[in-house]
Amino acid sequence: MSGTGRLEQNKMIVRRLVYEVMNAGGLDIIDEIYAPKLANAARNWISPFLASFPDTHMEIVDLIAEGDTVVGRFKCSGTHLGEWRGHAATGRRFTRVDEVGIFRIEDGRIAQAWSLEDTLRRMDQLGLR
């Protein structure tokens, strides 16, 4: 596969994470897009988040690939309908909270992932700070 083809394939894996898992709640897809050593950890983070914010919607703002790394900038929105970080559901909505994810792709799956998010903005919008 050409270098450009590999980069597009790597970006498609992150797109699947956003569209099929985070936006559509497809937890069963986690094993397809995460390496076996990371799949359970991803599920253990994503599942409770989606339970707390079942209408989660992530927008891809930027998606950049180089080598085996994909970096994404996202805007995330959702309604707080379940316990999150020890806080009871508020029923309030957060909108367009900035997030950045860095993903290392190995053998067509996410092998490592790091993320940063504007948690304070999310908490402010939910009335939790």
Write out the residue ranges for each language-model feature.
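C-terminal and inter-domain tail/linker signature
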Residues: 1-129
